[in-house]
């Protein structure tokens, strides 16, 4: 910006005192100070906006790079999965054709889900959770009878003589 030293400021003040006069000089100085402050705030706002735009542009660039990398990884994964699926289908077709020629059974092929359920023994998650003994639940501080907040308040509220309603 403009390089103003003490000697230049003193010269400007002396000229202003002569031209404007001692009566109006304080008012003019306040007005000039307000205008200079407003100009500085405007310049700072412009600088902040420019820096924000630069940051946003950098973030957009990083986002596009990240999206491209994610897309490449996704395509690679899909390609690998399709190759393995194709290899498994070919192996399954080959084993199915050889087993169908040697075995004339009912054609039942067990799925992984039924094998998992028969191996596990229990089908329901709640049954599995209920299989823990009560002494273990007490030791682990597991709640056995969960109660809502309203039910807990009703349970611990002192009994009154008559049943009150909100609308009475």
UniProtKB/Swiss-Prot annotation:
Q: Where in the cell is it found?
A: Cell inner membrane
What keywords sit in the KW lines? Cell inner membrane, Cell membrane, Membrane, Protein transport, Translocation, Transmembrane, Transmembrane helix, Transport
The membrane topology of this protein is: Single-pass membrane protein
Name the residues that span the membrane.
Answer: 1-21
Gene Ontology CC: TAT protein transport complex
Gene Ontology molecular functions: protein transmembrane transporter activity
UniProt xrefs under Gene3D superfamilies = 1.20.5.3310
Basic residues biased stretches? 117-126
Primary localisation category: membrane
* Location of the region described as Disordered in the Swiss-Prot/TrEMBL record: 92-132, 146-168
Q: Name one GO biological process term.
A: protein transport by the Tat complex
Which Pfam families does the UniProt record give? TatA_B_E
- Bias kind Low complexity: ranges: 94-107
Indicate the family of this protein. Answer: Belongs to the TatB family.
What job does this protein perform?
Answer: Part of the twin-arginine translocation (Tat) system that transports large folded proteins containing a characteristic twin-arginine motif in their signal peptide across membranes. Together with TatC, TatB is part of a receptor directly interacting with Tat signal peptides. TatB may form an oligomeric binding site that transiently accommodates folded Tat precursor proteins before their translocation.
Report the PANTHER family cross-referenced here: SEC-INDEPENDENT PROTEIN TRANSLOCASE PROTEIN TATA, CHLOROPLASTIC
Q: How does it assemble?
A: The Tat system comprises two distinct complexes: a TatABC complex, containing multiple copies of TatA, TatB and TatC subunits, and a separate TatA complex, containing only TatA subunits. Substrates initially bind to the TatABC complex, which probably triggers association of the separate TatA complex to form the active translocon.
Name of this protein:
Sec-independent protein translocase protein TatB
Q: Which organism is it from?
A: Cupriavidus metallidurans (strain ATCC 43123 / DSM 2839 / NBRC 102507 / CH34) (Ralstonia metallidurans)
């Amino acid at each position: 910006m403009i390089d103003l030293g003490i000697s230049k400021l003193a010269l400007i003040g002396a000229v202003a005192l002569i031209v404007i006069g001692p009566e109006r000089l304080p008012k003019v100085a306040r007005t000039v100070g307000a205008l200079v402050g407003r100009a500085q705030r405007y310049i700072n706002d412009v600088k902040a906006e420019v820096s924000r735009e630069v940051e946003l542009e950098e973030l957009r660039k990083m986002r596009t790079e990240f999206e491209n990398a994610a897309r490449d990884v996704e395509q690679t994964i899909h390609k690998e999965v399709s190759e393995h699926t194709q290899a498994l289908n070919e192996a399954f077709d080959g084993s199915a054709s050889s087993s169908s020629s040697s075995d004339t059974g009912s054609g039942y092929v067990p799925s992984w889900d039924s094998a998992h359920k028969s191996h596990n023994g229990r089908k329901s998650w709640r049954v599995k959770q209920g299989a823990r003994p009560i002494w273990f639940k007490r030791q682990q501080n597991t709640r056995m009878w969960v109660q809502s907040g309203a039910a807990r308040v009703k349970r611990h509220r002192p009994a009154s003589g008559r049943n009150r309603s909100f609308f009475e």
